[in-house]
Curated annotation (Swiss-Prot):
Its main location: other. One of its GO terms (cellular component) is endospore-forming forespore. GO terms for biological process: asexual sporulation; sporulation resulting in formation of a cellular spore. It is found in: Spore core. It holds the Pfam family SspH. This is Small, acid-soluble spore protein H 2.
Length: 63
């Protein structure tokens, strides 16, 4: 995913499913300069920082 798309998802009024390594997540914020996203797992509530490219709108494992 590109950082611009991640920002669009954050700003969207509707729910858009996002996945990190096949785990559903919520994008908390995006840093466009560093190309990173602060995310929260919907399964565990664990918060982590990841490269935006590792996020997906479809439920597929990203390498």
């Amino acid at each position: 995913m590109k950082s611009e798309r991640a920002k669009q998802i954050i700003d969207s009024k509707k729910y858009i499913p996002v996945y990190y390594k096949n785990t559903p997540v919520h994008i908390e914020k995006v840093d466009n300069k560093e190309n990173i996203a602060h995310i929260k797992s919907l399964n565990t509530d664990k918060e982590i920082v990841v490269n935006v490219k590792t996020l997906s709108e479809c439920n597929k494992l990203n390498n």
